[in-house]
């Protein structure tokens, strides 16, 4: 689904940057355990075609790097990425000033909210941002 959206936005080269937030298999209760994390499968599927940045408030940067992902601060991830993906429900991600962060991101932008942490209506203010997630058309 992500590749399809990016292709429709003409984002198909290795120049396309994806920012993945949440490497632990769950955000709450907080853990640094990445075993069986769906994020790892996602990265495996995307790494060949795109440049991947990542963030997790608990997982050490070294663990993120082991998966061929570049660790980055949240603000920098938003400013530098064509696609932003939230992969777990950590409280850090629930409390972001999402409108400000999206406003600063390159356009067009794909925002994938796998946990539906944010109301889709927030994104109505941004005609060049596509909001999607699991079970969202």
Predicted feature locations:
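Structural/interface elements that position substrates and couple domains in central-metabolism enzymes
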Residues: 1-137
């Amino acid at each position: 689904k992500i590749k399809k959206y990016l292709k429709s936005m003409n984002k198909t080269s290795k120049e396309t940057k994806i920012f993945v937030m949440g490497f632990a298999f769950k955000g709450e209760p907080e853990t640094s355990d990445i075993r069986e994390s769906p994020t790892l499968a996602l990265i495996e599927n995307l790494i060949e075609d795109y440049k991947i940045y990542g963030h997790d408030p608990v997982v050490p940067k070294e663990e993120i790097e082991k998966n061929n992902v570049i660790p980055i601060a949240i603000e920098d991830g938003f400013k530098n990425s064509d696609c932003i993906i939230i992969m777990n429900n950590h409280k850090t991600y629930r409390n972001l000033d999402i409108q400000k962060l999206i406003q600063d991101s390159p356009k067009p932008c794909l925002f994938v909210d796998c946990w539906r942490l944010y109301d889709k209506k927030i994104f109505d203010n941004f005609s060049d941002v596509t909001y999607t997630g699991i079970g969202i058309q």
